[in-house]
Each structure stands twice: as structure tokens, then as C-alpha cells.
């Protein structure tokens, strides 16, 4: 058997053309130029690395330890132990003094006026008012006072005044 004949080969598979010295030099320069741009910027080791690439952020990234103005003790000194002061407790007021304080409380008066005007208070304000009014009731019970006593005194005074008018007018 005979082998089939193949088509003639093109010149591409034949001898390759050799590059001239100038072409080789030019390719080498191009490769060197590309290689130069790899790696870190010159002086980055001494400058701190990121400062070369982000020049605008130097003020924000300053180390706070550099340039500190606080004095540093140079010798060995004994530690000064500060004595812990216990928190002073609020002095206990007498029930009468506490009641007077609550009755003259400006915030409580303002909130009560708003309630009487028909406004609705926030939950915090309403809770605060309720707590203060409850405390006033407790103090009045401790002291033996009540709202009714004041009203009865007023009624008695009015009755006496009416009696005096009648007596004077009747003469």
C-alpha cells in the first residue's frame, strides 16, 4: 500500500525568520520597563508604607504617641494610692420638708397645669407626675393631713363669716 500524498506545506511551518539585534534589544527594553513598575515605591520602607500611596490622609493617620506634651517621670517613684471616697447619701429630709419641696416643684406645677388644660403628656412625664403625686399622698398620710381637712377648715371659716354678717346685719 502506498501512502496518500499530503498537500504541500506552507512556509509557516518552515524556517522561522530570526529577529535582528535591534528588535531583540527593543523587546528587552520593553520587558525591563514593565518589570520596573512592580513592587513598592522607592523609600516606602523608611516612610512607613502607606504614606506614599495615600498622600492626602497623612494627618489622620498620625501616631498619637509622637509629640506628646505630657510630662514623663524619669525616676522611680512610689505609687500614690488615692483613697476611695464613698458616695454621700442624700440627707433624709423630714416628711414636712419633703412635702414642702414637692409642693413647690416647678416641673410638677407645669405638668399639672398642662394636664388641667387637657394636654396629654408623654409616658415618661405621666409616670413622673404619678410618682410625685403618690409620694405627696404618702407624706400627707404620715403627717396626718388630708385634702378634706383643708376644705373643712374653709367651710368652717365661711360659716363663721356668714354668722358674723348675720349678727351685724341683724342689729
Swiss-Prot record:
Residues 20-30 have a biased composition (Basic and acidic residues). Residues 31-40 have a biased composition (Basic residues). The keyword Metal-binding does not apply. Keywords: GTPase activation, Ribosome biogenesis. The keyword Repeat does not apply. GO terms for biological process: ribosome biogenesis. Residues 147-160 have a biased composition (Acidic residues). Residues 1-99, 145-171 are annotated as: Disordered. Pfam families: YihI. GO terms for molecular function: GTPase activator activity. Belongs to the YihI family. A GTPase-activating protein (GAP) that modifies Der/EngA GTPase function. May play a role in ribosome biogenesis. Interacts with Der. This is Der GTPase-activating protein YihI. The gene is yihI.
